[in-house]
Regions:
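Intracellular juxtamembrane helix-capping segments at the cytosolic ends
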Residues: 117-131, 341-356
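Cytoplasmic helix-loop-helix junction between adjacent transmembrane helices
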Residues: 107-148
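C-terminal ends and interior cores of transmembrane alpha-helices
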Residues: 83-98, 303-321
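Helix-to-loop junctions at the C-terminal end of transmembrane segments
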Residues: 60-73, 163, 279-293, 387
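Residue-level signature of mid-helix packing/kink "hotspots" within the transmembrane helices
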Residues: 54-63, 152-153, 274-282, 373-377
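Helix-loop boundary and gating motifs at the non-cytosolic
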Residues: 2-55, 217-222, 226-252
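Juxtamembrane intracellular "pre-TM" segments in multi-pass secondary transporters
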Residues: 1-3, 191-221, 254, 427-428
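Conserved MFS/SLC helix-loop-helix module at the cytosolic interface between two early adjacent transmembrane helices
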Residues: 59-96
Length: 428
């Protein structure tokens, strides 16, 4: 009997990521309005605290929620996660005008719990769904990454439009979307899951043993470094550098989107990037699903360096030398195409490792949230300091360093896997 399509879950994931991207925009606009009309001075430090509250909650709870999904079944978490998100955006509508920060911090903690419940459950579910089909696994994980990146990009656009049209009631629109996402999770087909019944101490011992396995232990620094690149290039830092009025004849990208229609031009550039990145993910999903995971990840590091060379050339092309873009832009696209293979390959690799601990699949896949969160915090923090010292070049320098660290660990892992395969082949 053929299995039902996993499309409802991927659609639900896309909607959740739309809400994630839109909520960041709408919340920022809401806080700006709150400062203007309520007379309460909300600073950049306060906004940073809200982000820290969300990430700290998600990072600390994701493994625990993944372990619970192993014991109780993933469907509960797939459905309850979006419902908690619905509650979170609804509560924002009731933010007090006097001293709103403690209330908003609590609301962000609720958002972190929602994400911690949902992401490990989705990845554990997809690993269960593709347990006996490696080629399907690569395709499904690529589609998950496409739903994630595409949803966030669409959400950023939707957030601004929703705020302009509906004001505070944009949060009500987000609540409706959370409800639709929960319905999609309900429609996701049932899949075979090995339910964990042992006590938490035994689970903890197994988890620590899994973490210390060379396949995963060597891989962790590489993935954190690549996730840090997302914190550098897919955060407000790059928007700030491109949009801030700044004239530097030696770095033409600094302030290149400032001035009239700068926001529109920036949206077109970022939108074009996300569209191309999504098309690259589709390619990796349907045409190269039989390429070894580690080889794809090594190819992605090559792509990072190609993109860095292109960005350096664009940034230092010199005034009036726009003709050189004919060389640098295609090179940049080649780099983006190659580097886009890392995320789906890494997710498929992590799912492969989970086959060795099928009972703890949700707990293990919860590492995705930890890697992504730690990496983004690292990229945002270091990116700000590098950009302060060296401008746009600083982001390129940091990217080169992080990619080099990732390359070292991937080569170590590649060598170990090759040796293990040789031993297996010799022993039969």
């Amino acid at each position: 009997m053929p299995r039902r399509s996993v499309a409802p879950l991927l659609i639900g994931t896309f909607i959740l990521r739309v809400n994630s991207g839109a909520a960041n925009v709408v919340l920022g606009l809401f806080l700006a309005q709150l400062t203007t009309h309520a007379g309460y001075a909300i600073t950049s430090f306060h906004v940073g605290l809200l982000a820290v509250a969300f990430f700290a909650t998600e990072l600390s709870l994701a493994p625990f929620m993944g372990a619970l999904s192993d014991r109780w079944g993933r469907r509960y978490f797939l459905i309850i996660g979006p419902l908690l998100g619905l509650m979170q955006v609804t509560f924002i509508l009731f933010t007090p005008m006097r001293n709103p920060l403690p209330y908003l911090l609590w609301v962000q903690v609720l958002a972190g719990i929602s994400s911690a419940m949902q992401v490990p459950a989705v990845l554990g579910y997809l690993a269960d769904y593709t347990a006996h089909d490696p080629s399907l696994r690569m395709r499904v994980m690529s589609l998950f990454e496409l739903a994630t990146s595409g949803g966030i990009a669409a959400g950023v656009v939707l957030g601004g439009i929703a705020w302009d049209r509906f004001g505070h009631f944009a949060f009500a629109l987000l609540a409706v979307l959370y409800l639709v996402a929960a319905a999609c999770m309900i429609l996701a087909p049932k899949t075979r899951q090995i339910i964990e019944r042992s006590n938490f101490r035994a689970v903890g011992r197994r988890y620590w043993r899994i973490i210390r396995t060379p396949r995963l232990f060597i891989f962790i620094p590489a993935w954190i470094c690549i996730c840090a690149l997302a914190g550098i290039w897919l955060s407000s830092q790059i928007t700030f550098i491109l949009s801030r009025p700044h004239n530097d004849p030696h770095q033409l990208l600094m302030g290149s989107m400032a001035g009239p229609d700068g926001g529109h031009r920036l949206s077109l550039v970022l939108g074009g990037y996300v569209l191309f990145f999504g098309l690259c993910l589709l390619f990796w999903a349907f045409f190269l699903n039989r390429v070894p995971r580690l080889r794809l990840m090594l190819i992605s590091i090559t792509g990072v360096y190609i993109a860095c060379i292109a960005l350096e050339g664009i940034n230092h092309r010199g005034i009036g030398n726009d003709a050189s873009l004919v060389i640098w832009m295609p090179l940049l696209l080649v780099g983006i195409f190659a580097e886009s293979s890392f995320a789906p390959a890494a997710l498929a690799y992590l799912a492969d490792i989970s086959e060795e601990a099928a009972k703890d699949r949700g707990l293990l896949m919860g590492l995705y949230s930890i890697f992504l969160g730690v990496g983004q915090l690292l990229g945002n923090g270091l990116g700000g300091e590098f950009a302060r010292i060296w401008g746009f070049d600083g982001l390129i320098y940091l990217t080169v360093v992080l990619a080099f660290v990732a390359l070292i660990f991937l080569l170590m892992l590649f060598r170990r896997e090759k040796e293990a395969f040789g031993i297996y082949k010799n022993t039969g």
